[in-house]
Amino acid sequence: MRGCLQLARWLSAGPKCPAASLPKAPSGLYNTIRSFTSSAQLASRARAASKPASDLETRIAQIPIDRYRNFCIVAHVDHGKSTLSDRLLELTGTIQPGSNKQVLDKLDVERERGITVKAQTCTMIYNHNGEDYLLHLVDTPGHVDFRAEVSRSYASCGGALLLVDASQGIQAQTVANFYLAFAQGLELIPVINKVDLPSAEPEKALQQMKTSFELDTENAVMVSAKTGLNVEQLLPTVVEKIPAPVGDTQKPLRMLLVDSWYDSYKGVICLVRIFDGEVRAGDQLVSFATGIKYYVGEVGIMYPTETSQTVLRAGQVGYIFFNPGMKRSQEAKIGDTYTKVGSEKAVEPLPGFEEPKAMVFVAAYPVDADHFEHLEDSINQLMLNDRSITVQKESSEALGAGFRLGFLGTLHCSVFEDRLRQEHGASIIITPPSVPVKVMWKDGREEIVTSPARFPEEDDLRSKVAEIHEPYVLATLTFPDEYLGKVIELCEANRGVQQTLEYFTSTQVILKYELPLAQLVDDFFGKLKGSTKGYATLDYEESAWQPSNIVKLQLLVNKAPVDAVARVVHYSQIERLGRKWVTKFKQHVDRQLFEVVIQAAVGRKVIARETVKPYRKDVLAKLHASDVSRRRKLLEKQKEGRKRLRAVGNVVIEQKAFQNFLAK
C-alpha cells in the first residue's frame, strides 16, 4: 500500500521527476491495478442496482399485475390522438395541465406536419376507487405508411380506444386500423372526439361505428380532447373494460424488444415489454436472435421522458440500455426475445413481428461526395427505430456514391428525408420514387428488380424474358358522393379496375379500386385531394403481382445515357414522361461550344428530343461583303470544327443541373 502512495506522489510531481529515480514497483501492484480496472464496471453496476427507490417507484412496486392496463389509441390521421394523449397525461398528473402540446410527438417532423410518425409510449398512475392502477399508453400513427408501427404497438397492448372525429365520421384508415386491432383480439372502446365543433354529428358517427364494425356503442364516450370535455370518463372505462396483461414475476425473464432509438450519450436505447420475470441493472442478458450477451446498465419507464427505476416486472413496458452498449445498431433486432444468461433452455422465444416489405424505392446521394460517410452514419442511426427501411449501396456516374433506399410508402420516404435533413443536417439528392418489378425469365427464374440499373436490356427483353409483373394494391377511398364521377375518372386514368362501390351513409361513399402501385406513388393522393377539394381519404393494402408492359425510360445526353435519371415505367407513360424530362433538363444544361442533344428513349426508340444550341462565333465579322468564296470556306471550317468537337468533346453538366432536375 505504501508503494502505491509513493508511486502516486511521484507521478503527480510531473516531468521533473527522472525516470531512473522511480522505485521498483512492489510485486503484484500491476495485477492490483488491472483487477481494479476490470472490476470498475461491475462496481458501477452494483451501485446502479443498489440505488434507493424513489417515491414513484415505491408506489409502482405496490401495484399488482392485475391492476396493470396496457392500451393504445387508434384512429385516422388528424382525428386527435396526440391531443387526447395530452389530456390523459394531465388527468393522471404525469404532466402539468396546459404546459405541453403533443408531448408524445417528439420528432420535429411530427410537430411540423401535425402527424404521428413514431409510436410513442408513456406510463401513468391512476387512482380508481381508492386503488392505484398502472396504465401504459401508446400513441400510434394513423397513416397507412406507418402500419408496421401500429401492429408492433398492438403487441404490447390489451385494448384500444377507437377514436373517430365527430365531424368527419369513419375514414379509410379508421377501417384499416379497426381490422388490424380486431385481428389482434384487442378490446375496443368507441370514442367520439371533437364533439364541441359546430359541424359535429356525434350520433351519426356512432351509427357508422355500429353498422360498419358491429361494435356495442352503449359504452361509447363523447369527448373533446381540445377542451377536455368528458375526458375524465375515459380512464374508468379503460380500467373496467381492458384486460390486465398476463405474466408471472417468478418465472425466468422473457422480454420482447418492441422498439429502439439512438442517444448520443447512452448509445442504443431499447423499448421492451416484460412478459415474465423481472430485469434489473447489473443483470446479464442474452439475445435469442444474435446470441450476444449484454450487461444491463439502466432500466426505467417513460414518464413521459426516460425515468430510471430499480426493476421492471412482468406486465410492464419500459426502456433499458446496456453497459457497455451495443457495438452495432444492427444488433437491436425489433421483435427479438431476451432472457437472463443461463435461462435460455427454460424460455420459449416470442413469435416476434412480421417484417414489413419495402414497396417504394428511391436513390439518395450526398450533395458533396466527401459527406458520404456522414450520410451513411445518419441513415444507420435513423434505421435503429425504423427497421422497415431497406438500404443498398449503389453508385452513379453522374452523382457518385449513394444508397438505394426502400420504404413502405411515399409519406414514409418524405418523412425519412425530412428527418435526415433536420436531425442530422444531411444535404442529399433524392431521385423520384419507383416500385419493384418481377422479371419472369424464360428459363423459369424469377427476379425482383428494385433498381433501373438491374432492369434487363432491350435484347434480353426480346429473347430471354417471358413476362414482367408489377405490384397492384387494393385501394379504399372514402369521400362525399358528389365527387364520385371525378374520383372514378381519376382511378380509370391511372389504370385502375373497380372492385366495389357502397354507401355507408346517405352522402358518404366507400369505393374500392385495384390500382398499380406505380400509379399510387406518382402523387395519386395529391390528385385525389385536388379532385375532391380535400375531402377524400385513402388507404391501401397489397393485392397481387400482375403481368404488365413495363419498359426502362432513359435520358440521353449526346447519345450517352444518364444513369441517375433512368426509370422503370409502364409503356403508356413514356410519351408524357419523355417530353417532360427533355423540356425540364434543357432548362438546367449550360450552352457548350457544340450542340447538345437531349433525348428520352426506350431502348433504341427515341420518344422526345430537345437541342441546346452552341455558342456562335461570328467568323465573318472581318470579311468584305463581296468575298463569297472566303465566306463559304470559313463557314465550312467552323462546321467541321463543331462536328469534330461533338465527336470527341465531353458534355460538361454541373451537378446542380441534376439537383434542379430531380427536385420536385
From Swiss-Prot:
Membrane topology, as annotated: Peripheral membrane protein
In the record, biological process GO terms are: positive regulation of translation; translation
Q: What class of enzyme is it?
A: hydrolase
Catalytic reaction list: GTP + H2O = GDP + phosphate + H(+)
**Which molecular-function annotation in GO is an example for this chain?**
GTP binding
Residue ranges annotated for the tr-type G domain, each copy included: 66-246
**Keyword Hydrolase in annotation:** yes
This protein's major location comes to mitochondrion
GO cellular component term of the entry, any: mitochondrial inner membrane
Q: Recorded E.C. number(s)?
A: 3.6.5.-
Keyword field contains S-adenosyl-L-methionine:
no
Any idea which positions bind GTP?
75-82, 139-143, 193-196
Compartment annotation: Mitochondrion inner membrane
Q: Give the range of the organelle targeting sequence.
A: 1-43
Sorted alphabetically, the keyword list is: GTP-binding, Hydrolase, Membrane, Mitochondrion, Mitochondrion inner membrane, Nucleotide-binding, Protein biosynthesis, Transit peptide
Against PANTHER family, the record matches this protein to: TRANSLATION FACTOR GUF1, MITOCHONDRIAL, TRANSLATION FACTOR GUF1-RELATED
**What family is reported?**
Belongs to the TRAFAC class translation factor GTPase superfamily. Classic translation factor GTPase family. LepA subfamily.
State the function annotated in the UniProt record. Promotes mitochondrial protein synthesis. May act as a fidelity factor of the translation reaction, by catalyzing a one-codon backward translocation of tRNAs on improperly translocated ribosomes. Binds to mitochondrial ribosomes in a GTP-dependent manner.
Q: What is this protein called?
A: Translation factor guf1, mitochondrial
Source species = Aspergillus oryzae (strain ATCC 42149 / RIB 40) (Yellow koji mold)
The upper taxonomy is:
Eukaryota, Fungi, Dikarya, Ascomycota, Pezizomycotina
User: Could you tell me the gene encoding this protein?
Assistant: guf1
